[in-house]
């Protein structure tokens, strides 16, 4: 075991206070630019060269530094956060770091800003201890992850040299039933779609429902043609490209248990879909694509009963290997037309990306898992992917490099709800894990 540099907990808390104290929710472009400037300053203070690239949305911050060995690791992060929602639901100001009973609270502390701060402190600890890094790093922090990363791919295509690396590591995912972070050798892809039904040019009295089409009913009928109450996605060809898990993936899937008790307690759900539990639950989350409806509204919104002018639904699909975003959009268009619903307008929303996948026995993925023994007393379990998306496809495709992600948040972390939190030691260990990964990368011949 190496004697790793040690992260300063005091400095980590100081950085968290700065980042959590800056509002930067999805779509708040001015606020996100301010957060990006702060992150750039933090990177410079830790000895990284920095380039802040403007986009039509939030800036993408890129920091880099070479190391003793030519191997370079790209670290993907994001700094945009979900809206805090009603502040009255929070025990603390969501944009002020709070500490209580070994936990830290604040919007972004468990997903986004917290893991980024942990990794920046890991880099700083290495430089402070040794004067240099064991190998090179490229840190990428974007502010439009939650809207599908619409500007990351174009920037990479335009500024390819800024991102060049030999492997990619991200922060995201779950923990197993024992609380140990899971290691993933891939991530699901994403496509988001808006469906719109429009009839009359103005809202009409409800009594006209006997003679005038209602766009909300029309939209509901369309949605019923997309997915059944048995969770089967009905779009023609949707599943055709999917390949089942490999023999090795199946072996792993039979052994991993999710933190079901933690989920049920934190989320206040009695059971999971179809009563799934144990290995079948994990297998479902890892291997299946999804079709989720996350918004449904009418225009205009009206308290008195009316026939609305239009109705809108927003869907998101999480994709597994061999599925492609535009192919899903095209298949949905053809499917609704075949069902006599060609009047439903379909709009692919900005962003989205294919899945990224490395073999679970890839040497880099194994390295990320194996060094877990130095931090957690045992290697991390490797899953091919989990119930989340990230735009790692861009890096994997551009450079032909392996990708991996390490779970951070817990079921109780409430990364989309009030009182987002995480045990402070979890963030410290997340940073220490990176230190061990960098040491291990410098001692291998992983690079091409």
Predicted regions and their residues:
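Acidic/His- and Gly-rich active-site-bordering loop/insert found
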Residues: 2-109, 128-135, 315
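Acidic, glycine-rich active-site loops and adjacent beta-strand->loop/helix elements
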Residues: 79-81, 103, 140-149, 171-176, ...
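A common structural junction motif
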Residues: 80, 226, 230, 333-342
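Acidic/histidine-rich catalytic neighborhood of metal-dependent amide-processing enzymes
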Residues: 104, 112-186, 446-448
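A generic structural motif
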Residues: 110, 201-203, 317-325
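A short core secondary-structure module
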Residues: 154, 209-231
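An extended, acidic, His-containing surface patch that forms the Zn2+-binding/catalytic region
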Residues: 177-178, 234-310, 318-331, 339, ...
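Flexible glycine/proline-rich, aromatic-decorated loop/lid segments
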Residues: 183-198, 404-406
């Amino acid at each position: 075991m190496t004697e790793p540099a040690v992260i300063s907990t005091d400095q980590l808390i100081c950085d968290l206070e700065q980042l959590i104290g800056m509002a930067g929710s999805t779509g708040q472009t001015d606020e996100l630019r301010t957060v990006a400037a702060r992150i750039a300053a933090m990177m410079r203070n830790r000895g990284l060269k920095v380039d802040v690239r403007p986009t039509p949305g939030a800036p993408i911050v890129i920091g880099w530094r070479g190391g003793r060995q030519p191997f370079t690791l790209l670290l993907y992060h994001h700094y945009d956060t979900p809206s805090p929602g009603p502040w009255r639901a929070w025990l603390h100001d969501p944009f002020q770091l709070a500490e209580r009973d070994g936990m830290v609270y604040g919007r972004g502390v468990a997903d986004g800003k917290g893991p980024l701060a942990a990794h920046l402190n890991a880099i700083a600890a290495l430089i402070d201890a040794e004067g240099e890094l064991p190998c090179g790093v490229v840190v990428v922090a974007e502010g439009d992850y939650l809207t599908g990363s619409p500007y990351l791919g174009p920037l990479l295509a335009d500024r390819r040299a800024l991102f060049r690396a030999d492997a990619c590591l991200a922060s995201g995912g779950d923990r197993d039933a024992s609380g140990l972070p899971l290691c993933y050798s891939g991530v699901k892809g994403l496509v988001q779609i808006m469906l719109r039904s429009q009839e009359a040019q103005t809202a009409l009295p409800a009594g006209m429902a006997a003679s005038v089409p209602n766009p909300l009913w029309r939209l509901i009928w369309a949605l019923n043609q997309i997915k059944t109450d048995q969770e089967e996605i009905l779009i023609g060809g949707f599943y055709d490209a999917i390949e089942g898990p490999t023999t090795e993936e199946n072996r792993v899937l039979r052994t991993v248990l999710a933190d079901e008790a933690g989920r049920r307690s934190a989320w206040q759900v009695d059971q999971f879909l179809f009563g799934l539990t144990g290995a079948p639950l994990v297998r479902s989350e890892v291997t299946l694509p999804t079709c989720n409806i996350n918004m449904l509204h009418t225009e205009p919104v009206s308290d008195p009963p009316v026939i609305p002018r239009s109705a809108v639904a927003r869907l998101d699909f999480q994709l597994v290997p061999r599925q492609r975003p535009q192919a899903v959009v095209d298949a949905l268009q053809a499917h609704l037309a075949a069902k006599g619903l060609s009047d439903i307008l379909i709009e692919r929303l900005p962003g989205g990306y294919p899945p990224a996948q490395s073999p679970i026995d890839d040497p880099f993925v194994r390295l990320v898992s194996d060094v877990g023994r130095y931090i957690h007393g045992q290697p991390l379990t490797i899953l091919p992917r989990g119930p989340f998306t990230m735009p790692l496809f861009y890096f994997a495709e551009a450079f032909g490099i392996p990708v991996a992600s390490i779970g951070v948040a817990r079921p109780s972390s409430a990364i989309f709800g009030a009182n987002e939190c995480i045990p402070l030691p979890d963030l410290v260990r997340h940073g220490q894990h990176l230190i061990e990964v960098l040491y291990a990368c410098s001692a291998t011949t992983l690079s091409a």
